[in-house]
Amino acid sequence: MADPQIITIPCLQDNYAFLLHDPSTGATACIDVPDAAPIQAALGAQGWTLTDILLTHHHWDHIDGVPALVEATGAKVWGAAADAHRLPPLDHALAEGDTIRIGALEGDVMDVSGHTVGHVAFHFPAATAVFTADSLMALGCGRLFEGTPAQMHGSLEKLKMLPPGTLVCSGHEYTASNARFALTIEPDNPDLIFRVERITAARAAGQPTVPSTLAEELATNPFLRADAPTVAAPLDMEGADPVDVFTRIRAQKDSF
């Protein structure tokens, strides 16, 4: 059987949407719809038919293109039941632990509240990918507009348990800025230093830095490393609860 295919689609100023395609059935899902036009262009270039739309959370820059894309394709819309009142009309309302099917591909729904309450991620083991939008991001995590630091930390702890080779398909090209901040937390982390060099080269060449891998994030993302002594020590928080360390890091990033 042919492997699932994932395409990263730049949208708006710095957003990403993703197409997930199951070659065995022809089913194709779009994860988040910042703008319909670039997604339709990508579908046309691949010769794929959109069957499903998966929404991670209610922010406008992740859902504004949904009406136009539904009108053009008739795709079914999936999203969190808890967020249904702030999402476009849903054909399938979801909660943590639910399984979704895109063709022959099964995906697990994860509650990753923090950036918003009701934010979900979609983990597709057969595609070795998790679509995290504004929860776990490349070298960062989403700003806490609605949830608490404890909620976001708990969400990230769930994501940390996925296989290290999992592709982290996050929702924005914020990686260069996140890298500059990460270096203020762990300036001597050799994995981070090497990753920043690759990020700088990719952006100079106009290439996306998303998706990353969970292994990269575990080694370099300060928001996944609140339990690491090398992260806590510069904050004078040795031995502190990782939730408190995470809270401090998030506060520093908010004013960075």
From Swiss-Prot:
Details of cofactor binding: Binds 2 Zn(2+) ions per subunit.
Reaction(s) the record says it catalyses: an S-(2-hydroxyacyl)glutathione + H2O = a 2-hydroxy carboxylate + glutathione + H(+)
Disulfides per UniProt: none
InterPro entries according to UniProt: Clx_II_MBL, Glyoxalase_II_hydrolase, HAGH_C, Hydroxyacylglutathione_Hdrlase, Metallo-B-lactamas, RibonucZ/Hydroxyglut_hydro
Keywords, comma-separated and alphabetical: Hydrolase, Metal-binding, Zinc
Pathway annotation from the record: Secondary metabolite metabolism; methylglyoxal degradation; (R)-lactate from methylglyoxal: step 2/2
Molecular function via GO: hydroxyacylglutathione hydrolase activity; metal ion binding
EC number assigned by the record: 3.1.2.6
Pfam families: HAGH_C (PF16123), Lactamase_B (PF00753)
Chain sites annotated for binding Zn(2+) 1: 57, 59, 115, 134
EC class (word): hydrolase
Cofactor: Zn(2+)
Gene Ontology biological-process entries: methylglyoxal catabolic process to D-lactate via S-lactoyl-glutathione
Chain residues that bind Zn(2+) 2: 61-62, 134, 172
Subunit record text: Monomer.
Stated role: Thiolesterase that catalyzes the hydrolysis of S-D-lactoyl-glutathione to form glutathione and D-lactic acid.
Record family assignment: Belongs to the metallo-beta-lactamase superfamily. Glyoxalase II family.
PANTHER family hit by this protein: HYDROXYACYLGLUTATHIONE HYDROLASE, HYDROXYACYLGLUTATHIONE HYDROLASE GLOB
UniProt name for this protein: Hydroxyacylglutathione hydrolase
High-level lineage: Bacteria, Pseudomonadati, Pseudomonadota, Alphaproteobacteria, Rhodobacterales
